[in-house]
Amino acid sequence: MSSQIKQVFARQILDSRGNPTVEVDVVLESGAFGRAAVPSGASTGIREALELRDGNKALFLGKSVYKAVENVNTKIAQAVKGLDALDQRLIDKTMIELDGSENKKNLGANAILGVSLATARAAASHLRKPFYRYLMDVKEYLMPVPMMNVINGGSHADNNVDMQEFMIVPAGFDTFSEALRCGTEVFHTLKKVLIADGYSVAGVGDEGGYAPDLPSNEAAIEAILKAVKEAGYEPGKHVFIALDPASSEFYKDGKYELKSENKSLTTEEMIDYYAAWVEKYPIVSIEDGLAEEDWAGWKLLTEKLGNKVQLVGDDLFVTNPSILAKGIEKGIANSILIKLNQIGTLTETFEAMAMAGQAGYTCVVSHRSGETSDTIIADLAVATCSGQIKTGSLSRSDRIAKYNQLLRIEEELGENAIYPGIKAFVFNSDEEVEEVVQEIIVEDSEAEKVVVQVEE
């Protein structure tokens, strides 16, 4: 039966914050079916593709997405009907040209992405392949090392912590399932530690981590390391630390305003702040350490810490190949965060990952703070052998859904699932040089495939 698109239908559903988002169904002539739900961010980069919302305060406080849904059910459906779902590049190119804007503001990135992902899922169903294997069909796959956001702050929580994410990285294990077990044990132990130290853990943040008021940002790291030890693990051997300060959120008038510590820091002082932490704690990754518009500062940060830790650009690059190219040219950062809805199509996401890999940058596949039960990013992380994933803490079903999907994939792959551990992080230190070369090549074939080779 034909793999041509027969029907495209969108609806409005709710995300993990109770806000409307877009869900799309695609049916092929063969009867194959694909469905995808689109996530949404809280702290968003100024150069992200546009998420189209209606703005009518009488409906969902202005957050409804009926216009984006209408765009899928009319303009986009008419444009892609009859196209071959196995030609992902053509599907995405058709929608990009139909939109006609630089940031997908006319149809909405949330409308376009929903169709892009649902079409890919339908194509995988047509070929009767798991989604990750449809994207890349090879013998061995890298399972991603998870960055687990166990203490939430910033825009993700209603507390006094300036920095947005304090994450544990269980990189000292041989399998993903062992790493996940460690993460859950540390997460539950952390609750006991926080309570014993007199902090409230009555609720969790958007990504499932605890959100206590703390005396300083550093207090979050200290609490986490205490929990790691009490859970029976060794910091720097079994568990490492990753940070996402989301510093654009506290960058005001050229200064970094750490209100919880009553500090106003220059770019140079902020870099020194991180450098002191890197020397003191087992930190392997810092995401958005400086503001997205502070490119001169990013250059200094990379020169000072780029050979010691992974420096991830999220708001800095917004999964955009053209912006990433500028960063590579200027020697800024050494890693990119991959968020599907920042760019709006699967094809452009692959292009960004290909460019990053060819430049020696690592790729971290990521969720958004407003998530759904959709597990596409788990398959994407495995398919591209990115080696790293951010999908929240060890609570909230919208986060756990991705971890459970990774467990299923590892089980299915058996000995062909490789957990890279600390080798997933590309950086040099004075004590040891660890080189991991990633080459990501986007190939044209019957299905859009990403081929990833990892050499040690």
UniProtKB/Swiss-Prot annotation:
Metal-binding listed as a keyword: yes
Residues that bind (2R)-2-phosphoglycerate: Q164, K339, R368, S369, K390
EC category: lyase
Cofactor: Mg(2+)
Protein's pathway: Carbohydrate degradation; glycolysis; pyruvate from D-glyceraldehyde 3-phosphate: step 4/5
Record's keyword terms, sorted: Cytoplasm, Glycolysis, Lyase, Magnesium, Metal-binding, Secreted
InterPro entries: Enolase (IPR000941), Enolase-like_C_sf (IPR036849), Enolase-like_N (IPR029017), Enolase_C (IPR020810), Enolase_CS (IPR020809), Enolase_N (IPR020811)
EC numbers for this chain: 4.2.1.11
Primary location group: cytoplasm
Catalysed reactions, as listed in the record: (2R)-2-phosphoglycerate = phosphoenolpyruvate + H2O
Binding site for Mg(2+): D244, E287, D314
Top-rank lineage group of the source organism: Bacteria
A GO MF term: phosphopyruvate hydratase activity
Cellular component, GO annotation: cell surface; extracellular region; phosphopyruvate hydratase complex
Subunit structure: Component of the RNA degradosome, a multiprotein complex involved in RNA processing and mRNA degradation.
Family: Belongs to the enolase family.
UniProt name for this protein: Enolase
Species assigned in the record: Francisella tularensis subsp. holarctica (strain OSU18)
Phylogenetic lineage: Bacteria, Pseudomonadati, Pseudomonadota, Gammaproteobacteria, Thiotrichales
